[in-house]
Swiss-Prot record:
NDH-1 shuttles electrons from NADH, via FMN and iron-sulfur (Fe-S) centers, to quinones in the respiratory chain. The immediate electron acceptor for the enzyme in this species is believed to be ubiquinone. Couples the redox reaction to proton translocation (for every two electrons transferred, four hydrogen ions are translocated across the cytoplasmic membrane), and thus conserves the redox energy in a proton gradient. The keyword Metal-binding does not apply. NCBIfam families: NDH_I_N. Its EC number is 7.1.1.-. This is NADH-quinone oxidoreductase subunit N 1. NDH-1 is composed of 14 different subunits. Subunits NuoA, H, J, K, L, M, N constitute the membrane sector of the complex. It comes from Solibacter usitatus (strain Ellin6076). Keywords: Cell inner membrane, Cell membrane, Membrane, NAD, Quinone, Translocase, Transmembrane, Transmembrane helix, Transport, Ubiquinone. The gene is nuoN1. It is a multi-pass membrane protein.
Length: 486
């Protein structure tokens, strides 16, 4: 469908979530000299207001869905779904950040501004229908995330995490951009709809097409921490502040998968035979490396990092299915994953104590008695990550493996189920430590649960259970959005 390049006033309304987040992020930095440091929680309140406004704007924009800015953006159900997911991740990240920033006596305005800028980039990624816009959104999100990872400037682990994240992330972005250059050279366009049309109706050298797809796959696989490009994730998740680790594990990953799905299921859909074997291999490698490496970990944050690699593999299984059902399953899974993983890291933020001193799994002995609410919420998140019924994780995995079976991916489904069984060991090990051992030093040093941290635990737990008990409405919207993804 041809799209007029002329400006339409509705374009600004369709772009409203990104405008709100950018303006409010800038406002936070402008207000920094004005607001007294003792009132630093005000920056968190402003950040929450901005995110709620952006959430409302995303829902409003869906009511006037359509292309914007000459077709560079596409505000549809797919974009709205992922906008809501990444903004929700931002809201859930703000709550544990209150206590973290107060404990560290860190600057709050810059932290929340970077958070808003990163989410703005992720929203742009979700709505992009043009490879240049994808790149811009990717860079906005990534640059802010690099700084957040090293936000504690006096912490050597945080500095190391930020440096590794920046260097490897820049390298991966180079691969992605080089792939974009190949696509432009082959099709004379960076618009996804036009690229799809060229691949469908014009002869293109299959070797060059395969190279372009592989280059872009490498760049995106890094962003979602999929094997064999996952090496950065454990060090970054361990070294970054725990609320930042929660954010990085869910928000940027969901946005990157939105790009993955939109590019590979629209522009690259006619050449699926070129990329399906690559995605199949990455899915299996991610599940195996993530789950088996997680078994060996003693640090809770590194364990969750390897767990996130395995979960990236599950989503890649849905992409390998190459079907509307697979896309819908991936969308549902990422929504559930956002709740359970942000919640898990929020629980870790509580249970590791002041300064995150107690990060070893053995330090969690007896936490079920000393921190009953945090331990109970952590249990819900771990069971959801495992895929136990009545949680969002169960239905997420069920829909993914069903989509894989429908596409006759028998071996990948079997291997995925076996990997899920392997995951039971390291998730249940934490529950055993928390509930079946006498309290240790960390449990004895436990502090009262702050209201902001209680919210950070209860809200994602409710989301996780809601998706496990009433999955239909989210899956229905995801299915409708996937059907319109062209």
């Amino acid at each position: 469908m041809p799209v007029s390049p002329a400006f339409n006033p509705q374009d600004a309304l369709r772009f409203l979530p990104e405008i709100i987040l950018t303006v409010m992020g800038t406002l936070l930095m402008v207000l920094d000299p004005v607001i007294h440091k003792r009132s630093s929680n005000a920056f968190g309140h402003i950040s929450l207001i901005a995110l709620v406004m952006a959430l409302g704007a995303s829902i409003y924009a869906y009511g006037i869905a359509g292309p914007a800015f000459g077709g560079m953006l596409m505000v549809d159900g797919f974009a709205t779904f992922f906008r809501v997911v990444v903004i929700t991740v931002g809201i859930l990240t703000v709550f544990p950040s209150y206590r973290f920033l107060a404990r560290q006596d860190a600057e709050t305005s810059e932290y929340h501004a970077l958070l808003l800028f990163s989410i703005a980039g992720q929203c742009l990624m979700a709505a992009s229908n043009d490879l240049i816009m994808v790149f811009i959104g990717l860079e906005i999100s990534s640059i802010a995330s690099y700084v957040l990872a090293g936000y504690l400037r006096d912490d050597k682990r945080a500095n190391e995490a930020a440096l590794k994240y920046f260097l490897l992330g820049s390298f991966a972005t180079g691969f992605f951009l080089y792939g974009v250059a190949w696509i432009y050279g082959l099709t004379r366009s960076v618009n996804l709809s036009v690229v799809r049309g060229v691949f469908q109706h014009q002869p293109v050298d299959p070797t060059f097409v395969g190279i372009a797809a592989a280059l872009m796959f490498v760049g995106l696989a890094f962003k979602v921490s999929a094997a064999p490009f996952q090496i950065w994730a454990p060090d970054v998740y361990q070294g970054a502040p725990t609320p930042v680790s929660a954010f990085l594990s869910a928000g940027p990953k969901a946005a990157a998968f939105a790009i993955f799905l939109r590019i590979f299921m629209t522009a690259f859909e006619p050449i699926s035979d070129k990329w399906q074997p690559l995605v199949w291999t990455a899915a299996l490698a991610s599940m195996c490396i993530g789950n088996f490496a997680a078994i060996l970990q003693t640090n809770i944050k590194r364990m969750l990092a390897y767990s996130s690699i395995a979960h990236a593999g599950y989503v890649l299984v849905a992409l390998t299915a190459h079907s509307e059902t697979g896309v819908a399953a991936a969308m549902f899974y990422l929504a559930g994953y956002a709740f359970m993983n942000v919640g898990a890291f929020a629980a870790v933020s509580v249970l590791t104590g002041k300064g995150e001193r107690y990060q070893n799994i053995d330090d969690f002995k007896g936490m079920g008695r000393k921190q009953p609410l945090a331990a109970a919420m952590f249990t819900i998140f771990l069971l959801s990550l495992l895929g136990v019924p009545l949680t969002g994780g169960f239905f997420g995995k069920f829909y993914i493996f069903k989509a894989a079976l429908d596409s006759h991916l028998i071996w990948l489904t079997v291997l995925g189920l076996l990997n899920s069984a392997v995951g039971a060991y390291y998730y249940l090990r934490i529950l055993v430590v928390m509930y079946m051992y006498e309290p240790g030093e960390a449990a004895d040093a436990a502090e009262p649960l702050a209201p902001s941290l209680a919210f950070a635990l209860i809200l994602p737990a409710l989301g996780t259970l809601a998706l496990g008990i009433f999955p239909g409405w989210v899956l229905e919207f995801a299915t409708k959005s996937a059907a319109n993804l062209k």
